[in-house]
Amino acid sequence: MNKKLFLLTAILAFLSFTACAKVNPQIEKLNRVLFSMSDRCKAAIPNGNPEEFLADLNSVLAEAENFRKDDLSLYYLIDKKHNVGQDYVPRDLMPVKGNELWNVSRNDLSLRPEAYHALEELSRAALNDGIKLMVSSTYRSYKYQEGLFNRYVKQDGLELAERYSARPGTSQHQLGVAIDFGSITDDWGDTKMGKWVYNHAAEYGWSLSFPQGYEDVTGYMWECWHFRYIGKKACQFQKKWFSDIQQFMLEFLDAWQKAED
């Protein structure tokens, strides 16, 4: 028997064994939501106890209750199919200036407060290991992203540009919770800074958005420098249950929140 069973199989087994008993409605909801996910997402979820999965999920959702209510959730799904309007601007953006914790590549950077404070945590940890982070890109307005995307289309053509640049309204940068670190080039991942961020970012709530080998899932080429702040609990949940792929977890959370109880 194949030892690599998916959570969905475990749920079906659980439901069959408890058919004559009162079933946890969250188990039934989990079954429906997982059936709606892509085959690749379902295949990424390891075998496990559905009730353990739900306990971890509820911990992540409880964390969301602490998010500010006057702005988008830190789990907000934005990608090629989900967008924000051209007028959306995160509330209370904080300027990201060069200081004793990090360097910057330009002087017009900013982040949502939650991401800013998480960057402080991440940067202090990096400094303790002898590394000073370089912050190269943060919040981008709809208009800024529009100009950037159009420039790339003119430079490389639409087909190629769409593989590495977001159309306006679909960029994580517009949410004010994403950072591009370092040189914004593939070789940055092999630098001391790049390796440190890759290995430690999740400890401080930062998740790699566009991993290598998942362009068909995320819609974008590998970007070793692009990290999104989602919080520590979500990073743990992502690693434990979604093969550490941010897109899978955010799609699941979006589907869960939209599904009927």
Model-assigned labels for residue ranges:
Residues 20-138, 142-261:
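Extracytoplasmic cell-surface/polysaccharide-interacting catalytic and binding patches
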Residues 8-9, 233:
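Intrinsically disordered, low-complexity segments enriched in polar/charged small residues
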Residues 1-4:
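Positively charged n-region of N-terminal signal peptides that target proteins for export
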Residues 9-16:
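Bacterial N-terminal signal peptides
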